[in-house]
UniProtKB/Swiss-Prot annotation:
Keywords: Antibiotic resistance, Cell membrane, Lipid metabolism, Membrane, Transferase, Transmembrane, Transmembrane helix, Virulence
Substrates-to-products reaction catalysed: L-lysyl-tRNA(Lys) + a 1,2-diacyl-sn-glycero-3-phospho-(1'-sn-glycerol) = a 1,2-diacyl-sn-glycero-3-phospho-1'-(3'-O-L-lysyl)-sn-glycerol + tRNA(Lys)
Main subcellular location of this protein, as a coarse class: membrane
Species of the source: Staphylococcus aureus (strain N315)
Name assigned to this protein: Phosphatidylglycerol lysyltransferase
GO biological process, one term: response to antibiotic
Chain ranges on the Cytoplasmic side, renumbered to this chain: 1-8, 74-89, 150-161, 222-229, 293-337, 391-394, 437-450, 511-840
Gene behind this protein: mprF
């Protein structure tokens, strides 16, 4: 049997053992808890002195400092260039994490290896030392087990009832001398032969400190037992939790303590309360402290240190891949820590709603409590809703949280006035101020699906909050009080109103205040870029007056965009030096991320698809543009007789065509205005992707006009120079609708012939929307749906008719796409584009 097979068998046995033990513990624990009166447990909790709780929590947080001695020993043995203060802070964070999700200490060992490898050359020796620390967690218990075996601690009651525990103690006790001998004979470092002994002593003291915390929990709930008997039960329970591989020993440890104290005659309600206090003081409080430390210890400085460390040499292949993510993970620790703290804060104060309700029921001034409860609940819900925003380092989310903290503080001060909780709120407020200064974005994009999700989540939380309060009051027999005039009346609707007011005010403030932050480059810079590097089919629209421009730092490339509904909608591909497009888009996306905007590209070509893909985008085919090859275009031949017939008809009617160069006279503009108004027929002009009838815009390029025999303008089209590939396009095409003549055909034919005479080789006839989209059953569902719209909704919009009309000119069809972020909705993105096009 080779080593690989042995390892697999061992892993299977370990998982089977842990699973079986977990099931056994869960069933037994459920059986024991089912007989407990939880109302009595709550009554016992209400009797606890608050100062005793404060001392307990301080002791629980301080007890974990002992574990930092492991890291002090480690840093001194390996002669690490790291300050004692940093060792203590980092160690505290590691140990708090390990206590919650320890899996027998393996999580802590992994984090230690990740952190300390940047401070030493000898990685192999580091791993050896960390392994020694991992094993010493058991040797401390082994030393304490020896004290039970030699009857220093009295465990006779539990050993008489559960005889197999005695053999476990013997085995664990025997492990200590083996470990000490082995660690001295084969030490990680020959100059530090007693490291194993030192770690064992640290482990022993730490377990005793944990035992003292639990014992103090028993004292404050009035569960008096002999310390010697208590410590014996604790050691056996700790062994059970450690070998179970369950994070924190949850379940296994608690079951043994519950059974052990039951044999000593302590009521189960008091034991349960004692365990809850112990879990909070020894696990939850250190985690809170660790999260606070993480907010300051890790982040940008840590990331820079790792990148600049002489010991940080990226490995190849998999190691390099993992290390590339490690730096980013460390940089996110502060915001993640604060987000977790805010989440726990909101949960704790949601529970405190019960205290306000309880006090209100026995107070005559219901109205005051009614308002304070609604404010308190609203603030708690706002805290909860902004947890993700705090993690994403959004200033708007942090401001929401800060206002919520202030509102909770006011409600707390005027109701149950817990100075412990007010102090905690002050700490969180300070952390939020620090986070606000570090925040790298003003706000996150507002998306419709997120709004709907937040509304549903809010309703769910408020419903759960109501069920919790009602259920607790019912369990405590408080519903015997008349409640139709109590604080719960109309509470839900007032809460919704307060939330709406706060959200509305802050959202308006950000949109109003930071709308001024949006920058726009000068149009002269864009003109210079186009003159130097060329344009595209849409570049002439820089003169339409409804766009803003964003250039790169060197002013060699730009894009044109417009803001709408928390989005920056970009028209077409970037323009300018193609080598600068990467830099341009990165700067633009950074700019949009800082302001909390989405980025949408409209009508882009397939030329730069890889570039857009690099920024996490996906694509939707909008349709195809008809590009006519003027070198092949002709009105001669049998197939083109329709073109000749159209031109001959206009000649017979003495309708002429000419190109008018700017500047234009007022009389000429008035003639065009008359035609345009009749053509629009009170319809609203479109914007953004097309030009509008505007004298300033029209004066930037020649205009083709058709005149009748009275020399009156009956149709016109505005030219769109492209400044690249000898191509040209037209924008506005308008005619007198009362004339029963093919004026659009006439304009196109005359423009095609004129463009060919002027030496142009390509003519853009515009896009056929949804043309050739989703034609294969392999296409995305959204594109197949768009294809069905193209085929079956021709009555609403002439999708097929537009393509058929342009097809008679035998164009080459080039695809055009919508580019949007992969986590955005297609339909919401399309909706924003349509709003930009249809509204100025």
């Amino acid at each position: 049997m080779n080593q690989e097979v042995k390892n697999k068998i061992f892993s299977i046995l370990k998982i089977t053992f842990a699973t079986a033990l977990f099931i056994f513990v869960a069933i037994t624990l459920y059986r024991e808890l089912s007989g407990i009166n939880f109302k009595d447990t709550l009554v016992e909790f209400s009797k606890i002195n608050r100062m005793s709780l404060v001392l307990l929590f301080i002791g629980g947080g301080a007890s974990l400092v002992i574990l930092s001695m492991y890291d002090v020993i480690l840093s001194r043995a390996l002669k690490m260039d790291i300050s004692l203060g940093k060792v203590l802070r980092v160690s505290y964070i590691i140990n708090a994490l390990n206590a919650i999700v320890g899996f027998g200490g393996f999580i802590g060992a992994g984090v230690r290896a990740m952190v300390y490898k940047n401070y030493t050359h000898d990685k192999k020796k580091l791993v050896h030392f960390i392994s020694l620390i991992l094993i010493s967690m058991l040797t401390g218990l082994s030393l304490l087990s020896l004290l039970i075996v030699f009857h220093v601690f009295d465990a006779s009651l539990i050993l008489d009832k559960i005889t197999w525990v005695r053999w476990v103690l013997y085995v664990v006790s025997f492990f200590l001398p083996l470990f000490i001998i082995y660690s001295m004979v084969r030490p990680p470092d020959k100059n530090n032969r007693f490291v194993g002994l030192y770690c064992t002593l640290v482990s022993c003291v730490e377990w005793l400190a944990a035992a003292v915390v639990l014992y103090f929990c028993g004292v404050i709930v009035d569960a008096h037992v002999s310390f010697m008997s208590f410590i014996a039960i604790f050691i056996i329970a700790a062994l059970s939790g450690l070998v179970s591989f369950i994070p924190g020993g949850f379940g296994a440890f608690d079951l043994v303590v519950l059974l052990g104290f039951k044999t000593l005659g302590v009521p189960e309600e008091k034991v349960l309360l004692m365990l809850l206090l112990y879990r909070f003081a020894y696990y939850f409080v250190p985690v809170i402290i660790a999260l606070i430390l993480s907010s300051f210890e890790f982040g940008t400085s840590a990331k820079k240190y790792i990148e600049g460390s002489k010991y940080f040499i990226p490995a190849k292949d998999v190691t390099s891949f993992l290390m590339s993510y490690q730096k980013d993970i460390i940089a996110k620790i502060p915001s993640l820590s604060l987000a977790i703290l805010v989440f726990f804060t909101s949960m704790i104060f949601f529970v405190n709603n019960l205290t306000i309700v309880y006090d209100a029921l026995y107070d005559g001034n219901h109205l005051t409590y009614y308002i304070l409860l609604a404010i308190h609940t609203s603030a708690c819900l706002l805290l909860l809703l902004n947890v993700v925003g705090i993690y994403k380092q959004s200033r708007r989310a942090i401001i929401f949280a800060m206002i919520s903290i202030l509102l909770i503080t006011v409600a707390t001060f005027f109701t149950y006035a817990s100075y412990i909780l007010i102090t905690w709120l002050a700490i969180i407020f300070v952390l939020l101020i620090v986070a606000f200064r570090r925040a790298r974005r003003l706000k996150r994009p507002v998306r419709m699906r997120n709004i709907v999700a937040m509304l549903l989540f809010s309703l769910f939380i408020l419903y759960v909050n109501h069920i919790f309060i009602a259920g607790t009051l019912y369990a405590l027999d408080i519903y015997t009080i008349e409640m139709h005039t109590s604080v719960l009346r109309y509470y839900f609707w007032l809460t919704i109103l307060i939330i709406a007011i706060i959200i509305g005010m802050i959202a308006w403030l950000f949109d109003y205040q930071f709308s001024k932050v949006r920058i726009s480059s000068k149009i002269e810079d864009c003109e210079e870029i186009i003159n130097q590097y060329g344009g595209n089919y849409l570049s002439h629209l820089i003169y339409s007056g409804d766009k803003q421009f964003f250039t790169n730092e060197n002013k060699t490339a730009f894009l044109m965009y417009r803001y709408k509904a928390s989005s920056l909608v970009v028209l077409g591909d970037p323009l300018g030096d193609e080598n600068a497009f990467d830099e341009l888009l990165e700067a633009f996306y950074n700019y949009a991320e800082y302001l909390g905007y989405d980025v949408i590209f409209y009508q882009v070509t397939d030329q730069h698809m890889p570039l857009y893909h690099n920024f996490g985008n996906q694509f939707f085919k909008l349709g195809e543009e008809a590009i006519i090859d003027l070198t092949q275009f002709s009105t001669s031949g049998k197939k083109r007789r329709g073109f000749r017939a159209t031109l001959n008809k206009f000649d017979e009617l003495n309708i002429s065509f000419e190109i008018i160069e700017p500047p234009f006279s007022t009389e000429f503009i008035n003639e065009l205005q008359h035609v345009s108004d009749l053509w629009l027929d009170n319809r609203q002009e479109m914007h953004f992707s097309v030009g509008q009838f505007n004298e300033e815009y029209l004066s930037k390029a020649p205009i083709g006009v058709m005149r009748n025999e009275e020399n009156e303008v009956i149709a016109f089209c505005s030219l769109m120079p492209t400044y690249f590939n000898d191509a040209i396009s037209v924008d506005l095409i308008r005619w007198l609708p009362e004339l029963d003549l093919p004026l659009m055909d006439g304009l196109y034919l005359h423009m095609l012939l004129w463009s060919k005479e002027q030496g142009y080789t390509k003519f853009n006839m515009g896009m056929a929307t949804l043309s050739n989209v989703g034609q294969l059953h392999y296409s995305y569902l959204r594109e197949r749906l768009a294809g069905r719209v193209f085929e079956h909704f021709n009555g609403l919009y002439r999708f097929q008719g537009l393509r058929r009309y342009k097809s008679k000119y035998n164009p080459n069809w080039e695809p055009r796409f919508l580019v949007y972020r992969k986590d955005n909705s297609l339909w919401e993105s399309l909706s924003k584009v349509m709003r930009v096009i249809r509204h100025k």
